[in-house]
Amino acid sequence: MVSPGAHDGWLVGSSADAVAHSPAPCLLSPLTAGLDPHLATMACVLPVGDVNGSLRDAAAAQPPPDGTLAGVLAHDPFRRTGDLLAELGARGVHSIVNWPSVAPLSGELAAALEHSGFTYQREIDLLREARAGGFRVAAVVHTRDQLQVALELGPDRIVVTPGLTTADARERRRQGEATTALARSAQQRSGNPVWLHLHPGFAEWLEGSVPAGVVVLRHAAGSSGA
């Protein structure tokens, strides 16, 4: 059950799904919305699937409702950012978020990706370019350091994600509590709407503890992950 004063939002795979959930907030990410959440968090920051192509096709089939966040992969080796943003804008996309993101990754995996150019800063650069092009932007964050970087950009909203799950229940609880605290800090410091990704692996620790006013980003029925 969502905390009193919090609001439901939805991760969706099509603009039609976003329309069906309207006026609730939605994040449109066709590829990640259909994957297991544990796989998608790690794999979708890599060009293993055409994240941006599926987003472009979804917007072409039906423009997403105004206010829907369109999840753009910043680390797309096959498209120029400017061309992609222009294409999305022409298809009725008005709001961009760096999703999927390397933000929740850590340790050796994060270090290897950063060495290959898959950096959080690159995602912030994408958002900066999108905002210069007239888009509203939202920034995904997982740590306080990332929140500071995101706030310097001045996004229209912050999306807090709990990161990768673990089999250790105590560690999941610690991460869940840290995520709630980060959402509260983002809300206080940004002065803008904050969304919290309710990753199924952390639902037991996040449900009922979300700060009032935060949008809880849930998985739409029929979708298994993000």
Predicted regions located by residue number:
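Structural alpha-beta junctions
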Residues: 5, 64, 90-95, 132-134, ...
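Hydrophobic alpha-helical segments and helix pairs
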Residues: 65-109
